[in-house]
Design a protein with these regions (language model features):
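Hydrophobic alpha-helical membrane-association signature
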Residues: 35-39, 76
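A short alpha->loop->secondary-structure connector
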Residues: 86
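Generic detector of well-ordered alpha-helical packing
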Residues: 10, 22, 43, 96-98
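Acidic (Asp/Glu)-rich catalytic clusters
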Residues: 108-114
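A short, N-terminal amphipathic alpha-helix
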Residues: 39-51
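Canonical Radical SAM [4Fe-4S] cluster-binding loop centered on the CxxxCxxC motif
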Residues: 2-34, 112
């Protein structure tokens, strides 16, 4: 079985930084919910194409993925764990803006499996 990683680009930011060259848009809650639903749908649609690989890393990049709520991230992670072969020692990483993150939010991310 092949091993690989999963990169999920979360294009949302609280504000657009002038130095950033990555694709991003400013945070709009209705857009984020629709985006998360589309990611989950895409994971389900591609289940058969993802079967021959074990995934040992999941990386949420962006944008600023930490603008997503714990529930939104948990929804994505549940879809991945339910439809992909995930290594039991998976590394799950999430980019955060240090000026916008709190200990409470980091603790909640840890509770849903982001390590």
């Amino acid at each position: 079985m092949n091993k690989s990683g999963i990169y999920l680009h979360i294009p949302f930011c609280k504000t657009k930084c002038i130095y950033c060259d990555f694709y991003s848009v400013t945070k709009r809650e209705d857009s984020i919910d629709k985006f998360v639903d589309c990611i989950v749908k895409e994971i389900k649609l591609n289940k058969g194409r993802l079967n021959n690989t074990t995934y040992d890393t999941i990386f949420f990049g962006g944008g600023t993925p930490s603008v997503l709520s714990e529930n939104q991230l948990d929804k994505i992670l549940n879809a991945l764990f339910n439809h992909c072969d995930i290594d039991q020692n998976i590394e799950i990483t999430l980019e955060c803006n240090p000026g916008e993150i709190s200990f409470e939010k980091l603790s909640n991310f840890r509770k849903i499996g982001i390590n």
